[in-house]
Amino acid sequence: LDQLKQMPDSTFNFDDVNLEYFKDVYVMLGHNYELFNGFSLMTGLAMHWRYTAYRNSEVEGRVRTRYNGFAPRIRVSWTPKMHYYMNGNRKVNIGSRCPTFVVDYEHGLNVLNNSGSYQRLEMSAEQVINIRKIHSLAYHVGGGFFTKQKEMYFVDFVDFANRNLPQGWNDDIGGTFQMLDGRWYNSSRHYIRGNMTYETPFLLLYPVSKLLSFIQKERVYGGVLFMPHLNPYLEFGYGIGTHLFDFGV
């Protein structure tokens, strides 16, 4: 880690360093319950079993060959003024004009062999704003950090992951970073990020809309990420949505 911190941002390249030292087996158990309208509480347990990917005398001389993790987890999600309807005895949420706020906390405990302690905290807010019924602006902002790490040198964020998409967005392209190397997601103890998508049926293709009637929506994407060696990282894109698929560049 000290060697990585000393590398200038302009010269840092993951392909120049070998970080594939460990394999990870991960299990997450959880239960989610809505305490009252719009306020959900998830409690769970996260467990990791990490071991060296291959025999390396340089690595084995500095760190252990096995690291285990045992961490109780709690996640709170609150959407003020949530609208809903009842389908029999089942409550169905249909959305709100207010943002959704999320706090996710995990506390690693030193209870297993070769385990260590740590704390992870992530916070975020996201919303889809409808504009005159046919346009929409969706945004997601958030940040997180690891702290009090003792004999545990891995960072595994939950909200900041290339597999994680915001809830309720109309496509699977916005809300995340499409071009970011996946190794960045677990390369820093802290991050701040923001993503937005503007969606409208009329934008660049409006003059030829009659010829391209199968296109339902046009979208403009933007994203910014702050973390060590990426200050900042920016992404911009354009996409279309049809009955069958979404496409973006």
Describe each PLM feature range.
Residues 29, 43, 68, 141, ...:
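Feature targets compositionally biased, intrinsically disordered low-complexity regions
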Residues 3-8, 15, 56-59, 139-141, ...:
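Extended interaction regions within the primary functional domain
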Residues 34-38, 81-83, 130-134, 201-205, ...:
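Outer-membrane beta-barrel channels and translocator barrels
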Residues 2-19, 89-94, 98-206:
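C-terminal outer-membrane beta-barrel translocator/porin domains of Gram-negative envelope proteins
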Residues 2-133, 219-221:
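Transmembrane beta-strand segments of outer-membrane beta-barrel domains in Gram-negative
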Residues 58-59, 153-154, 224-225:
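Short alpha-helix boundary/capping motifs
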Residues 136, 197, 201-209, 213-242:
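Outer-membrane beta-barrel transmembrane domain signature
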